[in-house]
Swiss-Prot record:
Positions bound to Zn(2+): H115, H119, H125
GO biological process: rRNA processing
Protein name from the UniProt record: Endoribonuclease YbeY
Top EC class for this record: hydrolase
The family this protein is said to belong to: Belongs to the endoribonuclease YbeY family.
UniProt key word Ion transport: no
Listed cofactors: Zn(2+)
Cofactor remark from the record: Binds 1 zinc ion.
EC number per UniProt: 3.1.-.-
Amino acid sequence: MSVDVTNETQWVIDPKVFSDLGIWVLDQMRVSTQSDLTIMFVDPDPIAELHMRWMNLEGPTDVMSFPMDELRPGDGKTVMEGVLGDIVICPWVAAQQAAAAGHSTMQEMLLLTIHGILHLLGYDHVTPEQERQMFGLQRQLLLTFFALRHDANVQATLPAGTPDALALYDAAHGAGRDLDSK
């Protein structure tokens, strides 16, 4: 199984934690070890462009998933293999959401990684029942991963003096983004 992690931001992020999380979640969901996944961390401008292009929604968002081979969780007897797809995460939006939720940016980005993987596997949260199922599963997966990997909750940080890219985006494009309108 291959989980490639790319960080195109100034955030200091340990790619191994996210690679390990991806491999572990795919194993828990019975996806073949021959499957591939890419996780990218980007600034507000690139994710805002993707958000507009693919969702026709303005502004940066926290996470977007781009499925490739439409793999689904395995039944325990057979496992699906192929290219699962790409997950794109904006640490700036994650940091804002984490502050609002009262937990660390790293916890938020790990949660968003699981959220993105579940979307790639066909989960959604359009209806209340789907939301209950998906959010319950992502919480269970995250808490279990933390229980197994105590070192997974290291902090994601920014080098001193790094300008706030989300504030710069808002200044250039107008503030007033609604984080709850995903």
